[in-house]
Protein backbone atom coordinates (compact mmCIF):
# COMPACT_ATOMS: atom_id res chain seq x y z
CA UNK A 1 0.00 0.00 0.00
CA UNK A 2 2.86 2.38 0.77
CA UNK A 3 4.36 1.84 -2.68
CA UNK A 4 1.00 2.71 -4.29
CA UNK A 5 0.60 5.78 -2.08
CA UNK A 6 3.97 7.28 -3.03
CA UNK A 7 3.96 6.26 -6.67
CA UNK A 8 5.37 7.64 -9.04
CA UNK A 9 7.43 10.07 -6.96
CA UNK A 10 11.06 9.80 -5.93
CA UNK A 11 13.22 12.05 -3.75
CA UNK A 12 14.59 15.12 -5.56
CA UNK A 13 17.66 17.18 -4.72
CA UNK A 14 17.09 20.94 -4.47
CA UNK A 15 20.01 21.55 -6.84
CA UNK A 16 18.10 19.62 -9.56
CA UNK A 17 15.11 21.99 -9.45
CA UNK A 18 14.51 24.66 -12.05
CA UNK A 19 13.77 28.10 -10.65
CA UNK A 20 10.08 28.75 -10.02
CA UNK A 21 8.04 31.84 -9.27
CA UNK A 22 6.73 30.37 -6.02
CA UNK A 23 7.50 27.51 -3.71
CA UNK A 24 4.16 26.39 -2.25
CA UNK A 25 4.21 24.78 1.18
CA UNK A 26 1.06 22.82 1.97
CA UNK A 27 0.05 22.68 5.64
CA UNK A 28 0.33 19.67 7.86
CA UNK A 29 4.00 19.21 8.71
CA UNK A 30 6.82 21.56 9.67
CA UNK A 31 9.21 19.44 7.54
CA UNK A 32 7.31 20.70 4.48
CA UNK A 33 7.98 24.27 5.56
CA UNK A 34 11.67 23.60 6.27
CA UNK A 35 12.08 22.10 2.79
CA UNK A 36 10.21 25.00 1.19
CA UNK A 37 12.39 27.49 3.04
CA UNK A 38 15.52 25.65 1.88
CA UNK A 39 14.29 25.79 -1.73
CA UNK A 40 13.72 29.54 -1.38
CA UNK A 41 17.02 30.20 0.40
CA UNK A 42 18.93 28.31 -2.32
CA UNK A 43 17.47 30.69 -4.92
CA UNK A 44 15.13 28.16 -6.54
CA UNK A 45 11.98 30.29 -6.03
CA UNK A 46 11.25 34.02 -5.98
CA UNK A 47 8.63 33.83 -3.22
CA UNK A 48 7.10 31.40 -0.74
CA UNK A 49 3.38 30.67 -0.35
CA UNK A 50 2.27 28.97 2.85
CA UNK A 51 -1.26 27.80 3.41
CA UNK A 52 -3.13 28.66 6.60
CA UNK A 53 -4.24 25.09 7.16
CA UNK A 54 -6.27 24.34 10.24
CA UNK A 55 -8.43 21.29 10.73
CA UNK A 56 -11.85 22.14 12.18
CA UNK A 57 -11.29 20.01 15.30
CA UNK A 58 -7.99 21.69 16.26
CA UNK A 59 -8.09 24.06 19.21
CA UNK A 60 -4.87 25.91 18.34
CA UNK A 61 -5.16 29.64 17.76
CA UNK A 62 -2.69 30.02 14.88
CA UNK A 63 -2.79 28.01 11.67
CA UNK A 64 0.30 26.18 10.46
CA UNK A 65 0.92 28.98 7.96
CA UNK A 66 0.85 31.71 10.59
CA UNK A 67 3.39 29.78 12.66
CA UNK A 68 5.58 29.34 9.56
CA UNK A 69 5.53 33.08 8.84
CA UNK A 70 6.86 33.75 12.35
CA UNK A 71 9.66 31.24 11.79
CA UNK A 72 10.50 32.79 8.40
CA UNK A 73 10.72 36.26 9.99
CA UNK A 74 13.07 34.91 12.66
CA UNK A 75 15.24 33.50 9.88
CA UNK A 76 15.42 36.88 8.14
CA UNK A 77 12.96 36.30 5.29
CA UNK A 78 11.48 39.65 4.25
CA UNK A 79 7.70 39.82 4.66
CA UNK A 80 7.12 40.70 0.99
CA UNK A 81 8.74 37.39 0.01
CA UNK A 82 6.21 35.21 1.84
CA UNK A 83 2.48 35.01 1.14
CA UNK A 84 -0.21 33.25 3.16
CA UNK A 85 -3.66 32.03 2.16
CA UNK A 86 -6.83 32.56 4.13
CA UNK A 87 -7.63 29.77 6.60
CA UNK A 88 -8.24 26.47 4.80
CA UNK A 89 -9.36 23.06 6.01
CA UNK A 90 -8.28 20.67 3.24
CA UNK A 91 -6.07 20.33 0.17
CA UNK A 92 -8.75 21.43 -2.28
CA UNK A 93 -9.29 24.66 -0.33
CA UNK A 94 -5.52 25.24 -0.27
CA UNK A 95 -5.42 25.05 -4.07
CA UNK A 96 -8.50 27.27 -4.50
CA UNK A 97 -7.01 29.96 -2.24
CA UNK A 98 -3.68 29.88 -4.08
CA UNK A 99 -5.60 30.17 -7.39
CA UNK A 100 -7.13 33.43 -6.08
CA UNK A 101 -3.70 34.84 -5.19
CA UNK A 102 -1.53 34.23 -8.25
CA UNK A 103 -1.82 33.80 -12.02
CA UNK A 104 -2.41 30.22 -13.13
CA UNK A 105 0.60 30.56 -15.48
CA UNK A 106 2.95 30.94 -12.50
CA UNK A 107 5.69 28.35 -12.15
CA UNK A 108 5.16 26.49 -8.87
CA UNK A 109 7.25 24.06 -6.88
CA UNK A 110 4.87 22.29 -4.47
CA UNK A 111 6.19 20.77 -1.25
CA UNK A 112 4.21 18.07 0.54
CA UNK A 113 4.71 14.50 1.71
CA UNK A 114 5.25 11.77 -0.87
CA UNK A 115 1.99 10.02 0.05
CA UNK A 116 0.05 13.29 -0.27
CA UNK A 117 1.69 14.45 -3.52
CA UNK A 118 -0.47 12.46 -6.01
CA UNK A 119 -3.67 14.03 -4.64
CA UNK A 120 -2.13 17.51 -4.34
CA UNK A 121 -0.76 17.33 -7.90
CA UNK A 122 -4.13 16.21 -9.26
CA UNK A 123 -5.93 19.11 -7.55
CA UNK A 124 -3.39 21.71 -8.75
CA UNK A 125 -3.64 20.40 -12.31
CA UNK A 126 -7.45 20.37 -12.24
CA UNK A 127 -7.22 24.02 -11.20
CA UNK A 128 -5.07 24.82 -14.25
CA UNK A 129 -1.61 24.93 -12.66
CA UNK A 130 1.42 23.09 -13.96
CA UNK A 131 3.59 22.23 -10.99
CA UNK A 132 6.97 20.81 -10.15
CA UNK A 133 6.37 18.34 -7.32
CA UNK A 134 8.89 18.28 -4.46
CA UNK A 135 7.83 15.26 -2.41
CA UNK A 136 9.33 14.68 1.03
CA UNK A 137 9.03 12.14 3.86
CA UNK A 138 9.16 8.91 1.92
CA UNK A 139 8.20 5.81 3.88
CA UNK A 140 9.37 3.36 1.22
CA UNK A 141 13.09 3.84 1.81
CA UNK A 142 12.90 2.03 5.13
CA UNK A 143 14.49 -1.42 5.27
CA UNK A 144 12.38 -4.38 6.32
CA UNK A 145 13.81 -6.02 9.42
CA UNK A 146 12.38 -8.52 11.94
CA UNK A 147 11.25 -5.48 13.97
CA UNK A 148 9.09 -4.42 11.01
CA UNK A 149 6.62 -7.17 11.93
CA UNK A 150 6.16 -6.11 15.55
CA UNK A 151 3.26 -3.70 16.12
CA UNK A 152 4.37 -0.20 16.99
CA UNK A 153 3.03 3.32 17.34
CA UNK A 154 5.06 4.38 14.29
CA UNK A 155 3.56 1.61 12.15
CA UNK A 156 0.06 2.58 13.28
CA UNK A 157 0.80 6.24 12.51
CA UNK A 158 2.04 5.40 9.00
CA UNK A 159 -0.92 3.11 8.34
CA UNK A 160 -3.39 5.79 9.40
CA UNK A 161 -1.64 8.39 7.17
CA UNK A 162 -1.86 6.09 4.18
CA UNK A 163 -5.46 5.13 4.91
CA UNK A 164 -6.40 8.82 5.21
CA UNK A 165 -4.63 9.58 1.94
CA UNK A 166 -6.48 6.85 0.04
CA UNK A 167 -9.74 8.13 1.56
CA UNK A 168 -8.94 11.62 0.26
CA UNK A 169 -8.05 10.36 -3.19
CA UNK A 170 -11.26 8.34 -3.39
CA UNK A 171 -13.31 11.36 -2.27
CA UNK A 172 -11.84 13.66 -4.94
CA UNK A 173 -12.03 10.95 -7.60
CA UNK A 174 -15.72 10.49 -6.82
CA UNK A 175 -16.35 14.25 -6.60
CA UNK A 176 -14.78 14.92 -10.01
CA UNK A 177 -16.48 11.88 -11.52
CA UNK A 178 -19.98 13.11 -10.68
Where would I find each of the regions flagged by the language model?
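A structural signal for short, hydrophobic/glycine-enriched beta-strand patches
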Residues: 2-155, 159
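A transmembrane-helix-recognition feature enriched in membrane-embedded lipid enzymes
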Residues: 158-178
